[in-house]
């Protein structure tokens, strides 16, 4: 502790208390100055002393502070490392869960589609020859529906998902908590028409059922491709293997990543034709930068993975 002194001057502080002649504290002026005006004479004043305490840090406290700071930093570093390990473990578990779901659904849907095609045409062969027109129509609608789904997805993405259905699609533009997100509901919704078309085409004969069967196959093929490219390659929800090295698919992934940056007002809204959309709005330069960034990131991840395994 240290004491300090401070002073203050007050004029006539005791004027009312000591106004009697016996305790007059006024300064006596010499007679030579009595002729001056009263305004020029000295006034009465008092000096007040206030004792002020100042707290000083002791040497012991100053010596202990660096040790406590270093220990706190060590605890913080250990806590952050623990949190990072937990986050990586959770991400690994989520990717494994989604990979199992993707593989099972893809295998199941593909197997059912192949069996449906085989049994449908073999069932029709029992009653006679297969109509070439019906077979061609089934094949044409399969390709046409797969291509048409790209344009449907582009329109729905812009006019519905980023508009009236944004409350559901917003989960796809935020950090995901867990292996699934609310946006995955759209995949289930799109599976409904495919199941209906396949069922009607399988259990009925004729050209129209054959066309419906082909359309259902096309929607199914597009859904599987969309899942592996969009969920696996772009957002890395599960490993996709060698398709990450396909140049055009790498370009597709980079284009969709620019959609999430919102640099071109959400363009591209499509997936497989996303690079074409970016070209129309002058986004080729940004697309090339994103492709280079993804290549570097992929090589870095591959290098770290191989070093850790060795």
UniProtKB/Swiss-Prot annotation:
Nonheme diiron monooxygenase involved in the biosynthesis of xanthophylls. Specific for beta-ring hydroxylations of beta-carotene. Also has a low activity toward the beta- and epsilon-rings of alpha-carotene. No activity with acyclic carotenoids such as lycopene and neurosporene. Uses ferredoxin as an electron donor. This is Beta-carotene 3-hydroxylase 1, chloroplastic. It is found in: Plastid, Chloroplast membrane. A motif (Histidine box-2) lies at residues 169-173. The histidine box domains may contain the active site and/or be involved in iron binding. The N-terminal part of the mature protein (70-129) is probably involved in the formation of a functional homodimer. The chain crosses the membrane at residues 98-118, 132-152, 183-203, 208-228. Disruption phenotype: No visible phenotype when grown under normal light conditions; due to redundancy with BCH2. Bch1 and bch2 double mutant has no visible phenotype but lower levels of beta, beta-xanthophylls and increased beta-carotene and lutein. Cyp97c1, bch1 and bch2 triple mutant is paler and smaller than wild-type. GO terms for biological process: xanthophyll biosynthetic process.
